[in-house]
Amino acid sequence: MLAERTRNEAPSDEGFTLIEMIVATLLFSLVTITIAGVIISATTAERSVRTVTSATSAGQLVMRTLDAGLSSAASPITVTATGSDQYIVARVPSRGATLTWGCSAWYFSSADRTIRQTTSSSSISISASGQRSWTLLADGVRQVGTTPVFAASGTIGAVVTFTVDAGTTKPVSFASTITTQSPATGVGTC
């Protein structure tokens, strides 16, 4: 009687069938792939924003230092090209309590793709290898076509045009004409 009873009992409906397990696995995989895609997209976008921000900050630093130096410089402001490298030299006032004049220079190296800057109380010696010890303002700098990075604007200023690489996105462009606001002349040369 006991053996007969176990044979007649209905099979248990507990647990999952193989098809239910396959469907659940496929749904879980689909959700996981979607979430992974969103995370990868967000990471890529964040990386792009970071490189553009870094390039923008470097270019703005170059423009700020040029503007601060050249807008108060005594004329003449000298813009020179040596091969594909270019540099600006200007006689600038000190920021101290008494007015003294010093020299500032900005150097674009096409080989290193950098813009560097230095200041001195006396004249500045310009050489392609010597400028590597100067303060680095920006790297990844390129000319815009055949337009020089630094070009003279008479004897009282400079036209500055360049791009800064921003990783895999479009380079960030900068262009400005900076002229001296100082009436000072004849305060020596650099």
Cite the ranges covered by each PLM segment.
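Aliphatic-rich helix starts adjacent to a transmembrane/signal segment
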Residues: 2-71
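Short linear sequence signals and composition-biased patches located at protein termini or domain-edge surfaces
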Residues: 3, 142-190
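Residue-level signal for beta-strand positions within conserved beta-sheet cores that form or flank
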Residues: 14, 102, 174
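Short, cationic motifs built from Arg/Lys/His that form the positively charged side of catalytic pockets
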Residues: 60, 71, 105, 117-118, ...
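Surface-exposed patches in mature extracellular/periplasmic domains of secreted proteins
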Residues: 78-80
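Type IV pilin-like appendage domain
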Residues: 82-153
